[in-house]
């Protein structure tokens, strides 16, 4: 697919462009309204097309609890008895959707207690309508999102079966939430993985106490604009971090329900690095 079309979709989903304007511009790029409509299925998430770990997988067990006051979500753990490190899975700007639920199950299959937090809990929970979810995410203040993250991390350190260590992995909006959690200096936060997430202000970097793994896509100009300043601050302050750039990949390359932007090669490599990193620091 033409990169200009992918970039337009990114601006639409992250920059406040309304759907009418998006469709008009898409029609211009595609050549006609009819052609534009044929492109939409590849641009928008199709949850029926990808599910790596089914809900009934016998290796895991899932529930939808409130792990702390106002902290609801999707909790998945290995079926086998034992103690495990815990990971907060932070969703994109469309809420706790089927894709993020699948990612949460994948994390549990790797040997973690995984909690896909629903950051829209206070607004009634993630709706089925993704456009509505995106609007609701836009109403969340940074302080509200951070408070949710910190409460979730604190609860996960004490949840039944936890080894007492908790980290976080986030995607897109959730990647930015991981970076925000890192600069909060929360003592319960032991490791973070941010997939193409907005960077924290350089002035806040000295507060970071946990190691970070940062995944970026080479075609993601919007997010990549902040890398240089953030990395310079990480280096200057002697922070433990790994940064990987995935050549030829787009923002959201991990999302296997999005045909236009998913990159299996980048996603598989980033996932293996993510699991190894979290086991190193939380295991």
Where are these regions (language model features)?
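Short beta-strand/loop motif that positions the catalytic acidic residue
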Residues: 214-216
């Amino acid at each position: 697919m033409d990169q200009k079309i992918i970039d337009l979709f990114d601006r639409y989903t992250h920059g406040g462009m309304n759907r009418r304007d998006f469709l008009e511009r898409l029609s211009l790029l595609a050549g006609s309204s009819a052609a534009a409509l044929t492109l939409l299925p590849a641009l928008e998430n199709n949850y029926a097309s990808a599910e790596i770990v089914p809900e009934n997988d016998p290796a895991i067990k899932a529930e939808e609890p409130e792990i702390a006051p106002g902290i609801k979500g999707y909790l998945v753990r290995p079926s086998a008895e034992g103690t495990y490190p815990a990971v907060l899975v932070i969703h994109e700007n469309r809420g706790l959707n089927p894709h993020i639920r699948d990612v949460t199950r994948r994390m549990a299959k790797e040997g973690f207690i995984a909690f896909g937090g629903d950051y829209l809990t206070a607004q009634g929970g993630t709706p089925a309508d993704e456009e509505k979810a995106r609007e609701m995410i836009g109403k969340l203040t940074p302080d509200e999102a951070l408070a949710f993250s910190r409460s979730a991390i604190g609860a996960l350190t004490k949840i039944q079966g936890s080894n007492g260590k908790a980290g976080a992995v986030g995607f897109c909006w959730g990647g930015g939430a991981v970076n925000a959690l890192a600069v909060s200096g929360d003592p319960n936060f032991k490791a973070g993985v941010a997939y193409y997430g907005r960077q924290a202000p350089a002035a806040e970097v000295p507060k970071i106490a946990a190691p970070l793994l940062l995944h970026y896509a080479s075609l993601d100009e919007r997010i990549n604009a902040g890398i240089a300043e953030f990395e310079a601050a990480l280096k200057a302050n002697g922070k433990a971090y790994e940064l990987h750039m995935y050549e030829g990949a787009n923002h959201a390359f991990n999302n296997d329900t999005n045909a236009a932007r998913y990159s299996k090669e980048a996603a598989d490599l980033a996932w293996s690095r993510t699991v190894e990193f979290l086991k190193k620091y939380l295991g």
